[in-house]
Amino acid sequence: MLPLMTHRDSPDPRRRQLLRVGLASTALVLPGLGPGLRAGHAGNGVDAFDLDWHDARRDRPVPVRVYLPARTHEPLPLVLFSHGIGGSRHGYRYLGEHFAAEGFASLHIQHVGSDRSLWAAGSPLSLVARLQTAAQASEAIARVHDLRFALDAVLAGPLGARLDPQRVVAAGHSYGANTALLAAGARVVREGRVLDLREPRLRAVILLSAPPFYGEPALPPILGGVDIPSLHVTTTDDVIRIPGYHSAVDDRVAVYQAIGGPRKLLAVFEGGSHAIFTDRASPGGPWLNARIKTATRELATAFLHGTLAGDDAALRAWPQRHAERIARLEAVGVPGLVVLPG
């Protein structure tokens, strides 16, 4: 069984419905961009596009949302974002809009076998069983194929001319971090064979609350072969709670310690929770929630600028800006960064 697990995009179904209505009311079809592409202005110089793709080979829908800078003529680096279990393409908006405002395209993939439909399908009494089914190896593998299909589709489609295929990054939260790890080169053995799902076009990976590989006796054989830069972000109270899949912050640290690559960074925030990295404003309380989100998105873009453009100035300055919230900061391959051992 491959890992698992996060929280839904929003705790309130009425809030999710209002969001859907609001997006639908502002959407328009852009001429020249092809069928299935709908757009709305997200503010702050950012445009957001919904695309409803279908992978014919697997007969599986792959809905996505793309965040782009509203005005740019340069080819954009691309972030492929994978949501946690029970999420959707509309989640992690705070990251998508920030990436776009900083000059990146951010493509948020919805994984239909482990998306928000889990919360509404069937009886509440069977919810745990549905979550456990969504965490099985077949869905974990399908998620990586979703990511690869989305990358192929966006590069081959009308938006491809605006993107730089040499600067592609995978990112994800919880189950989505597991998806990103598998795409980055994590190798697990199932039924006597190695599952090598590596996507060679990835230049780096961003992991929010990465779970362990459940049932595996050791992480180094799985993660030691990852050879691209990685950013790991968690909190001291980052705990996954689901029957059969309990995981705390020590597991996030173990993933960081086991992973290979020439450059890696671990940031552990004081306080917070597993759900604080979603769009929800309540986990940790409004004050802490807002500050951890701000620190996370600034760290992510600083890491990307350093990794993709070779400029670590923002990354070296980041700890001083957020020192009061950092419980632990470690790094390999980031010269001049002041670390804070936990």
Region locations from a protein language model:
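N-terminal secretory signal peptides
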Residues: M1-P13, A24-A27
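Alpha/beta-hydrolase-fold serine-hydrolase catalytic core, especially in secreted/extracellular enzymes
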Residues: G271-S273, T278-G342
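Primarily recognizes the serine-hydrolase "nucleophile elbow" in alpha/beta-hydrolase
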Residues: D152-P220
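Serine-hydrolase catalytic machinery in alpha/beta-hydrolase-like enzymes
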Residues: R57-L163
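A domain-start/cap signature at the N-terminus of enzymes
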Residues: G36-L68, L202, V334-L337
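Glycine-rich His-Gly loop
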Residues: F81-I85, S174, A210, T235
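Active-site rim elements
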Residues: T133-S138, E216-L219, G284-T294
